[in-house]
Amino acid sequence: MALFEDIQAVITEQLNVDAAQVTLEAEFVKDLGADSLDVVELIMALEEKFGIEIPDEQAEKIVNVGDVVKYIEDNKLA
């Protein structure tokens, strides 16, 4: 589950939340207190960390931590 832990680390740093709050079901806005700018900055940080690009239309569909994990698993080059 190293991927989740890497994603969790980025989220805790970007949103300044406790790691225990960052679960697969946690929604960025509702559960982690992010606003729309926070989410944009988080997506950018994840893109940089994992060397991927998340198009805007996909980013709009990412609402919780599990969505991020799935997107990165499906799109990260091995």
From Swiss-Prot:
Q: How is it modified after translation?
A: 4'-phosphopantetheine is transferred from CoA to a specific serine of apo-ACP by AcpS. This modification is essential for activity because fatty acids are bound in thioester linkage to the sulfhydryl of the prosthetic group.
Q: What pathway does the UniProt record associate with this protein?
A: Lipid metabolism; fatty acid biosynthesis
State its location(s): Cytoplasm
Q: Does the keyword Lipid biosynthesis apply?
A: yes
Q: What does this protein do?
A: Carrier of the growing fatty acid chain in fatty acid biosynthesis.
The family assignment reads: Belongs to the acyl carrier protein (ACP) family.
Give the protein's recorded name.
Acyl carrier protein
Query: Which gene is transcribed and translated to give this protein?
Result: acpP
